[in-house]
Amino acid sequence: MGDAADPREMRKTFIVPAIKPFDHYDFSRAKIACNLAWLVAKAFGTENVPEELQEPFYTDQYDQEHIKPPVVNLLLSAELYCRAGSLILKSDAAKPLLGHDAVIQALAQKGLYVTDQEKLVTERDLHKKPIQMSAHLAMIDTLMMAYTVEMVSIEKVIACAQQYSAFFQATDLPYDIEDAVMYWINKVNEHLKDIMEQEQKLKEHHTVEAPGGQKSPSKWFWKLVPARYRKEQTLLKQLPCIPLVENLLKDGTDGCALAALIHFYCPDVVRLEDICLKETMSLADSLYNLQLIQEFCQEYLNQCCHFTLEDMLYAASSIKSNYLVFMAELFWWFEVVKPSFVQPRVVRPQGAEPVKDMPSIPVLNAAKRNVLDSSSDFPSSGEGATFTQSHHHLPSRYSRPQAHSSASGGIRRSSSMSYVDGFIGTWPKEKRSSVHGVSFDISFDKEDSVQRSTPNRGITRSISNEGLTLNNSHVSKHIRKNLSFKPINGEEEAESIEEELNIDSHSDLKSCVPLNTNELNSNENIHYKLPNGALQNRILLDEFGNQIETPSIEEALQIIHDTEKSPHTPQPDQIANGFFLHSQEMSILNSNIKLNQSSPDNVTDTKGALSPITDNTEVDTGIHVPSEDIPETMDEDSSLRDYTVSLDSDMDDASKFLQDYDIRTGNTREALSPCPSTVSTKSQPGSSASSSSGVKMTSFAEQKFRKLNHTDGKSSGSSSQKTTPEGSELNIPHVVAWAQIPEETGLPQGRDTTQLLASEMVHLRMKLEEKRRAIEAQKKKMEAAFTKQRQKMGRTAFLTVVKKKGDGISPLREEAAGAEDEKVYTDRAKEKESQKTDGQRSKSLADIKESMENPQAKWLKSPTTPIDPEKQWNLASPSEETLNEGEILEYTKSIEKLNSSLHFLQQEMQRLSLQQEMLMQMREQQSWVISPPQPSPQKQIRDFKPSKQAGLSSAIAPFSSDSPRPTHPSPQSSNRKSASFSVKSQRTPRPNELKITPLNRTLTPPRSVDSLPRLRRFSPSQVPIQTRSFVCFGDDGEPQLKESKPKEEVKKEELESKGTLEQRGHNPEEKEIKPFESTVSEVLSLPVTETVCLTPNEDQLNQPTEPPPKPVFPPTAPKNVNLIEVSLSDLKPPEKADVPVEKYDGESDKEQFDDDQKVCCGFFFKDDQKAENDMAMKRAALLEKRLRREKETQLRKQQLEAEMEHKKEETRRKTEEERQKKEDERARREFIRQEYMRRKQLKLMEDMDTVIKPRPQVVKQKKQRPKSIHRDHIESPKTPIKGPPVSSLSLASLNTGDNESVHSGKRTPRSESVEGFLSPSRCGSRNGEKDWENASTTSSVASGTEYTGPKLYKEPSAKSNKHIIQNALAHCCLAGKVNEGQKKKILEEMEKSDANNFLILFRDSGCQFRSLYTYCPETEEINKLTGIGPKSITKKMIEGLYKYNSDRKQFSHIPAKTLSASVDAITIHSHLWQTKRPVTPKKLLPTKA
């Protein structure tokens, strides 16, 4: 074990990591972490990152994450930016970057601007506290982009791609950095594919000459051998499909393309076999690849990958810049630096990669070695045992680590995630499709056929069973899915799979599995050594995708080898690639297994089970006949599927015995068993619950479970993988089940809680198993009864026919043909009986044959609807039940006559062919006919002979009591189907037909859809397998009666031998037709055609067509020599057509006999034919009506859909129009409102202008009186000026109120006048106008004296109080004419100033104006603009703050301590005033707010 577990490999083994679910993944935190990790690494160097900066986050006591203060400080201080920027931007050492602004400027010089949500990031943003993280992320992203641009450019990428791709299209060239990175990845990966293709061609060339397998006398065997044994050759043709990268983030989440890129540059560090390349990547597969990439970057690229697994897996768009910089770093390493380990891959000739050197190359898994790595040194089965116990919980689907490839690259097997056996993952195991992780199909069509696997993915065999269902959409229907490989999610104690590690883990193994052909030959029986090896059930998919665990191809081949004494066995390459070899220690069991395997039972069983597997669906009935003789549609036979169920029980017996032995000998079978059914501690897909839960079982229980596992998929239609919870699902540790087997993986054995669960599962399974067996036994009884009944029916029907025809004389030809058929039938019956005596095998063989030969018989029992097989077995016709010795003797004599007529029938073939041509012409006139090519008589005869020799061949089957079975390969499959349909329709008039044993059958076919050659189909339920198309010779009965009774007897014998069921189901005509078919197919080997033709003319019918069996019609015709296919419209004259058919059938049988043969034997009744014709016409009419109705319905449906679509479009259009109208109306109303408001404003201004103009005179008169005011104002040095400043009305100025001024009590008249002309605005406010509009009106009125004319409305500025101060000066501080000079000067100073904010300085709380100051809120500086007072005022000097109230035209005291932009006036402490200054008279004190 130690040699297998290389410590380095162990270290590189990946465990399925615990990742955060998508719902819990914090994208913003991930972005911050990625950016900071990159920035810190670039600032300090990867090796020198301070410890406190390695993890930027810390968690507080409330479990909340925050960025560490040191990191925040470094960001705020710009140290990280300056360090990284100096490196990235290559700034001058003499002029290092200092501060955020320097870095921003340096980036700007490169054409990169730091923007956060389309806003330029400034140094102020980067200095903000608390830290504004979005600005810093934008800064780091810009630095990343600068680094990316330095490392990668479009020119560099194109130059690099030119090394690997000579051809360029202008449209392909990248247009930006991101596109350039994707272009580089795709070009390199394309080049890698080309290299692999070239290497593959070399390998193919090298392996073409290698023997693919041993020839066998059986053509069936020979056809199977290449596909199975040459699996390596076919698998070589599959290249890993490295996905194209079209979206850098989303297409990189599985790591396939990136890992392939790394492999190309570092093929010795990251081998292609170590990369998980699959069509459908599971979560674990993606994580595996991403871990592989991360580990590579960690070890070789200076830790340039600053992502977590979640970052790469979820690929948020926010980390695109991080991903780009990572790819740029890769490009720099691979294309610029090119360290020693970077050695771009080149085409390596065959054998250039020494296998033995592989251990020295870093490998990702201890279990990856190929069996072929060394011919003598095999890793022991316990390879994975040294893995730590903490890993033992890995779900089984991730635990199959074998990711190895042979030196020739045969089969790459990647474990889905961990490559480690016995670890548990962090996500629950999901139910998956029944095919677990096997990505290939086995095609047996041709030796050189390429196996169809999931499209061109690199890992042709993935051990992951998640998401790797067989791509049935890409697999042809006939490619059977025989998954002979070990199911993937089985957890073995030791990772070695039988295919790869062909040695037992125990040291007592006497020898290793031979690796060369000679050794394999000498150990021919090696395949039998393990019951659960090649011979144990494999996962087989039936037509419905359910698992049927049946023997695999290799098992069948091995059985054939054993029975046929074939000397050769597959080569080591093929063994390693999937042929399961087992250690010689099991040779003791060879005899036991051989008994079962070589027994005819097992041979046939295996073949039967495999029949659905072969691509052309050839069914081997126990004798290897040419492939042409094997019917093609066996895979559709439900009875065959049923048969495979019983088959497995036999297969189980040997394996059970071996299992018991295995357990007793303490052999670690798990290490060697690729079979799902092995009862091991690994919860394999087919393993029982007990095995998954680690309960030790007795051999009896084990047998029960093995059997259960076999039948789970088959009987229940679902794989045991789905029904049996695996250990990982049950959270039960996987434990070694047998005490004798040492624990190699060191997994804990939890047998307390797990035993309870397991024992319950055991009981459940036992009950199910008993039920299954009871059902199976009943089924077998039914089948046996059915077989006996068929034999009885055959004999009875034949004797009945003989009796009825006893009076007539049949022509020698007919006698000969009939005799031959009967003879063959009896021979076949005898063979069948002898086979049945052999035991289960013969019984199953007979069942297969019966199912093949007697689909019709089953139908006849159930004329129109499929009947439960059990019920079908019991059906029998009354005439067939009466059987006596005399009849049997007559039957035997008739067979002899048939033999003698064989030669004569051959001579008749020429004449029949002429007749066929005539009939074909008529058919063309009357109906649509599709006639398959008619095989030559020699070929058919030849086919007949081998089948006859085989005794079990399909050709002989028709003569047996079984219903006819076609011996012809492909044409028959189609023919069979149509014929089967005809049988079904004919069966409807069954009561009458039973009376008239054989003739009416031909007419019924036209009734059904089958009458249309292309439309003919048989429902599988009705005809499980139509192995042979039926030749319907319509009037067999009539002509035969005339010609000779013996010939009719012969024909009827044929019919009966083919299927007495047919006789029961069909009228005599049917039977005769069938006999002809059998004679034709067997003796004349005429192609049996499914088309049932109604012969339109009695004349043609009258023409003798004795050997209708001979292909009078092309393959379609042989079946219905007398039948002419008539189109539904042509079926109108059914009577006439039917009669000719009947006659013609008879006449075709006795072609030599002319019109005198028109005599109708009891089998032909014209009335019945007419009735059938009528029915056929009715059915045709019904069918036409139905078709017409369907077409009309379809048309109506289409019309309705079109109307609905039109209505929807109309509704959509109307809705859009309405929406547009509403928007237009809204816009129009808004415009009208705005216009109205504008006009109203102008009008108000004009009104106020006219009202205010006379006002100054009144004011003057009234103001003359208070002389103190005049004095007060005159004394002030500044004179007011008329209102240019007031003309620009701002929002501030408009906010003045309309209250009366309270400068002095003597102002009341003025205030009254003001109130008078403020009334319009008040009315407006009553009408709902905005208050600010009222205010503007008021202010404009108040400043009416200075207003010189209409002014444009100006939107007030929110940041300036300039207009408020102007208002205050004009209406409060320096109001009146006296102060006009002073006011004018002050306003002029204000206009000159650039300041936005002004402050008025009052002397004290009396609000006497002293001076005007400018105020800067940013710097909080207060400087004098004009007036008396200190040059500048500081915060400490301020005593009170005042706000101007425009409504009341006075200042209000603000009880605040902090100066802000909303303050309009201030006072300073009184001690700051010089008392010597003349004191101005006090004004009226304003009211304090």
Swiss-Prot record:
Chloroplast is among the record's keywords: no
Main subcellular location: cytoplasm
Bias kind Low complexity: ranges: 405-415, 680-699
Region of interest called Disordered, as start-end residue ranges on this chain: 375-415, 611-639, 668-730, 812-844, 925-1017, 1032-1078, 1096-1152, 1191-1349
Domain CKK: 1349-1483
Domain of life: Eukaryota
Keyword terms, alphabetized: Cell projection, Coiled coil, Cytoplasm, Cytoskeleton, Golgi apparatus, Microtubule, Phosphoprotein
MBD region, as annotated region: 922-1034
Quaternary state and interactors: Interacts with CAMSAP3. Interacts with KATNA1 and KATNB1; leading to regulate the length of CAMSAP2-decorated microtubule stretches. Interacts with a complex formed by AKAP9 and PDE4DIP isoform 13/MMG8/SMYLE, which recruits CAMSAP2 to the Golgi. Interacts with MAPRE1/EB1.
Similarity remark: Belongs to the CAMSAP1 family.
Biased composition annotated in UniProt, kind: Pro residues: 1105-1117
GO CC terms of this entry: ciliary basal body; cytosol; Golgi apparatus; microtubule end
SMART domains per UniProt: CAMSAP_CKK
Designated name of the protein: Calmodulin-regulated spectrin-associated protein 2
InterPro entries: CAMSAP (IPR032940), CAMSAP-like_CH_dom (IPR022613), CAMSAP_CC1 (IPR031372), CH_dom (IPR001715), CH_dom_sf (IPR036872), CKK_dom_sf (IPR038209), CKK_domain (IPR014797), PRC_barrel-like_sf (IPR011033)
Subcellular locations according to the entry: Cytoplasm, Cytoskeleton; Golgi apparatus; Cytoplasm, Cytoskeleton, Cilium basal body; Cytoplasm
